[in-house]
Amino acid sequence: MTKKYVLALDQGTTSCRAILFDRDSNIVGVAQKEFTQHYPKPGWVEHDPEEIWSTQYGVIAELMARYNVNPEEIAAIGITNQRETTVVWDRNTGKPVYNAIVWQCRRTAGICDELKAKGLEEKVRYKTGLVIDAYFSGTKIKWILDNVEGAREKAERGELLFGTIDTWLVWKLTGGKVHVTDYSNASRTMIYNIRELKWDEELLAELGIPASMLPEVKPSSYVYGETDPNVFFGHAIPISGIAGDQQAALFGQTCFEPGMAKNTYGTGCFMLMNTGDKVYESKNGLLTTIAWGIDGKVEYALEGSIFIAGAVIQWLRDGLKLIESAADSEYFASKVPDTGGVYIVPAFAGLGAPYWDMRARGTIVGLTRGTNKYHLVRAALESMAYQTRDVLSAMEADSGIKLQALKVDGGAVANNLLMQFQADILGVPVERPVNIETTAMGAAYLAGLAVGFWADKQELVAKYKVSRRFEPTMDEQTREKLYKGWQRAVTRAREWEVEE
């Protein structure tokens, strides 16, 4: 039977999706289902790995049935996933020893403080490209080994396995035959040496993590194994692409050359710039991370994460009840020519790159008697664009590369007012692609390339279509005046929360 499709599995923080792409990179079908978020204590976030698997498997089955797809028509499967989220399971039974600890979970902040007190920050940054933070997998693994009864003993005996979500899904899809991850996901664990491309023995010893738990690290476009026919509707299909969600979006946006960048506007924002074979050590609060491994080489990226982006619009809707739906924000914001001098700094959970200020809190500044709800809605939207400029300035400073255009994706990019303001405040064009499912697209591309479904990256570049290009129209003087106002507003939000 002709191989017509590539199946992308997009395992996100709140939902599992299965998306089918054809040779022309068109979406043939989508199935999606949300799963449960567990909050056992304030600041703790967990997922049930078995529920993630059953939900992911369910959407695959739903997709095949709804669009009448024969598994034989699928050339390959690509996986993209929420990064850093940590699963530890028993090698023999296949059962998790604890819930998955999600990337947002802050329970290991104390372990991070201990590592910082030991003076390990420079070493961790040099080896892993990351800052010491509860966000990454390393301290989560340590927490499970230290706090789940019998876990450490089992791990020492070689009976436990660790994986990020990609690893867990491949293990399940192959019927427990393959324990693997890719370079991009490994680079988010805080225990992987991104220069030497191996698990770092010194950091493993520091955290007390046995090397026997760790998956083998492979390229992002590579045949890792095949689905177990008993699991996958009687068929053995190659699993041949893996990348963490943000790296997958960079690939899906065809940012294949150094200096190309994309920004994903979701709950938060994630901006990545391809830096080719260069490992830039950030002096400006960015992360250095592996973009992907393909064609026998590893390429790197600079990454800046903004904690609150689209979430500020949800807050206007649910917290303040200023709007009824997220789509209203563009209409309300367009009622006024500007914010009337109002700035909102949405530091609800501290500030991410380039500040990394956990004690910053949200502020609204510049209010006058003339301020109305339209000004507030507009200021909330503009905060996403200002934060993006903060990150871009840091990237340009670290890499010495001047951005030519910003490629964008994610839910909020449908907002034309936001995209135009983004182009204006950056002073560079903003490109919105026809297909905004770039994360799944990236996973599909990586998988398809590994099995020859697509010939090479050039073929993918030719398929990339821009739906709209927003050119900057603001003059330099206005742009800099507005941005200086934003910088002043940020200083008001910094270090607000005081330790009791």
From Swiss-Prot:
Keyword terms, alphabetized: ATP-binding, Glycerol metabolism, Kinase, Nucleotide-binding, Transferase
GO CC, alphabetical: cytosol
InterPro entries xref list: ATPase_NBD (IPR043129), Carb_kinase_FGGY (IPR000577), Carb_kinase_FGGY_CS (IPR018483), FGGY_C (IPR018485), FGGY_N (IPR018484), Glycerol_kin (IPR005999)
Enzyme Commission (EC) number: 2.7.1.30
Catalytic activity: glycerol + ATP = sn-glycerol 3-phosphate + ADP + H(+)
Residues annotated as binding glycerol: R83, E84, Y135, D245, Q246
Annotated residues for binding of ADP: T13, R17, T267, G310, G411, N415
Binding site for sn-glycerol 3-phosphate: T13, R83, E84, Y135, D245
GO aspect biological process, one term: glycerol catabolic process
CDD domains in the record: FGGY_EcGK_like (cd07786)
Top enzyme class: transferase
Gene Ontology molecular functions: ATP binding; glycerol kinase activity
Residues noted as binding ATP in the record, renumbered to the chain: T13, T14, S15, T267, G310, Q314, G411
Keyword Magnesium among record annotations: no
The protein's annotated pathway: Polyol metabolism; glycerol degradation via glycerol kinase pathway; sn-glycerol 3-phosphate from glycerol: step 1/1
Summary of activators and inhibitors of this protein: Activated by phosphorylation and inhibited by fructose 1,6-bisphosphate (FBP).
Subunit structure as annotated in this protein's UniProt entry: Homotetramer and homodimer (in equilibrium).
UniProt record similarity statement: Belongs to the FGGY kinase family.
Its job: Key enzyme in the regulation of glycerol uptake and metabolism. Catalyzes the phosphorylation of glycerol to yield sn-glycerol 3-phosphate.
UniProt-recorded name of the protein: Glycerol kinase
